[in-house]
C-alpha cells in the first residue's frame, strides 16, 4: 500500500494517513530495527513495545532483503486497520512502504 501524507508544514512535517481509511490518527504500537551488513545472514533485531525492549539475532520480518530495515506498527483510531510502515535499504536506495 502506498504511504500518503497530508500537506507538509514547515517545522512540523506532514501527517501520515491510514492506508485503509485515510484517517490521520495513527498510534505507534511496536517499533522494530533490523541491523546487518551487506547480504549477511545474521544481524541485530531490536523491538520496542509497551515500554519494553527486546533484542535478538532473528532477522525474520526485516523489510530489506539485503541490509538495514525499520518497521513501525500502527493502530488507527478511525478503523480496525493495523498498518505497518516499513523502511528498507537496498543497493543505496531507501524504500518506504505500508504492509
Question: Which sequence ranges carry the predicted segments?
Answer:
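Beta-strand-rich cores of mature extracytoplasmic or soluble domains
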Residues: 82-85
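Short recognition patches in nucleic-acid-associated and regulatory proteins
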Residues: 2-4, 14-17, 23-71, 88
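Cys/His-coordinated zinc-binding microdomains
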Residues: 20-22, 77-80
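A short, surface-exposed interaction/processing loop segment used at functional sites
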Residues: 89-99
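Non-catalytic beta-sheet/beta-sandwich ligand-binding modules that flank or precede catalytic cores
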Residues: 11
Amino acid at each position: 500500500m502506498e504511504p500518503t501524507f497530508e500537506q507538509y508544514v514547515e517545522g512540523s512535517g506532514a501527517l501520515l494517513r491510514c492506508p485503509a481509511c485515510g484517517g490521520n490518527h495513527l498510534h505507534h504500537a511496536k517499533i522494530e530495527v533490523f541491523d546487518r551488513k551487506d547480504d549477511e545472514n545474521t544481524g541485530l533485531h531490536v523491538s520496542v513495545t509497551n515500554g519494553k525492549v527486546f533484542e535478538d539475532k532473528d532477522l525474520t520480518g526485516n523489510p530489506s532483503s539485503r541490509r538495514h530495515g525499520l518497521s513501525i506498527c500502527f493502530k488507527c483510531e478511525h478503523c480496525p486497520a493495523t498498518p505497518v510502515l516499513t523502511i528498507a535499504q537496498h543497493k543505496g536506495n531507501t524504500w518506504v512502504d505500508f504492509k
